[in-house]
Amino acid sequence: TDTSTEEPTLETIAYTRKKRSGQLAASLDHLPTETIHYRLSEEEQVCLCCGEKTHEMSTQVRRELKIIPAQVEVVEHVQHIYSCRHCEKEGTETPIVTAKMPAPMYPGSLASPSAMAYLMSQKYSEGLPLYRQEKQLERMGVSLSRQTMANWMIYGAHIWLIHIYQHLQKKLRAEDIAHADETSVQVLNEPGRAATSKSYMWMYRTGRDVSPIILYEYQPTRAKEHPKAFLEGFSGYLHVDGYAGYHHVSNVQLVGCWAHARRKFDEALKSLPVALQKSDQPCGAKTGLQFCNRLFAMDKKINQRKDCTPALRYEERLKQSQPVLDDFLAWLQTEQQRVAPKSKLGEAIIYCLNQWSKLITFLEDGRLELDNNRGERAIKPFVIGRKAWLFSTSQKGAKASAMIYSIVETAKENDLDPLKYLTYVLEQLPLIDLTDEA
């Protein structure tokens, strides 16, 4: 053994995380607080040393969380009716006066605004399907079938929430930047269609610089007529993926999604042998991915500037992103001539070339985004919820789901508690003259 050979130095990498002391405690300050005091009795307030009376010098506080489970109560609305005994004795016409009582939200049912809001919130915000809510209510001593719960929510959506939904749709159409996306949904009882037929939930939302609005719309197909009809009156930029159905929407400039373009090159890279993926050896998939990464890195750096505005973003993109795009396009056109079109890399190149006019639209306005991730994030709650409840039974139920999801997700985006907001609107809407458009 050559003892003169030095052993390699081992580098120890230590990670230091900032201690988040007090963050949780501070986040509880807005909650109702119950205070319990623990004091010595008069007999115990005696010094163990000299026998004199002690005094309170300080306190120490321990905090803990108390969770109060949901509970169900019955509310009886008793309406009192009055008449005049004097008129009764005189034999004259007796006037009868009935005390005013708020109209029921759902006549002939046990549904209250709070009960309906709770069921909606549990399913569409917390992802709890109706069969599990049915079991949960049974444990609370209430026998409420999932069919009854479904009927309540369909009624609440089609009679009350539809007014908010339609108002939000008008607001969204008045904007000049929007995002769109769509995903499949199964509806069992659609007229003239098999239960296994694929239907669609479409999503439309506002851009980043205005008050958030997220709207879902159920349609039995993925046909081009649906986004065209929903966005009738909208004029401006529409962030989309590569689906051709959006091409027929009138008065819009489509904005392509660089996240989709990047994903194509990422898939092309992953289709290569692992050794080549991890090596420094250049290849087309890596080059395409690097072009996309440069665009995202530039945009991130611009957005992180304290003085970032849409105007600044527009100017900086022309300076920084435009040259990269020019080089990327030249590379795509060259590579297309020598790459097999049906290979993963060929598919990525063709996708970018076919989408190019939409992919460079983000240069036209500093408010536009590089991708449609905002739209994809907005449709994700529906996709996650679908894994729990799997399907809708009827078209009416699917339309109700679209409206409820719209109200819930818009409330969340505006930092509102969905349960509290649903309760509020279901309490207030029956009291409003909804025929007055003003």
Placement of each model-derived feature along the sequence:
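Short, flexible loop/hinge motifs at secondary-structure junctions
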Residues: 1-110, 179-180, 206
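Gly/Pro-rich turn-and-neighbor structural signature
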Residues: 2-7, 25, 39, 44, ...
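Mobile genetic element proteins and their domesticated derivatives, centered on retroelements
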Residues: 46-50, 84, 119, 133, ...
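Short, positively charged, Gly/Tyr-enriched micro-motifs
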Residues: 51, 65-176, 408
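Short helix/loop capping segments that flank catalytic or ligand/cofactor-binding pockets
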Residues: 56-58, 92-95, 187-189, 212-214, ...
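Structured ligand/cofactor/substrate-binding pocket environments in proteins
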Residues: 113-117, 123-129, 216-249, 398-405
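Conserved beta-strand -> loop -> alpha-helix junction used to position metal-binding or nucleic-acid-contacting
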Residues: 177-178, 242, 250-290
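Acidic/histidine-rich catalytic cores and adjacent linkers
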Residues: 235, 243-247, 282-438
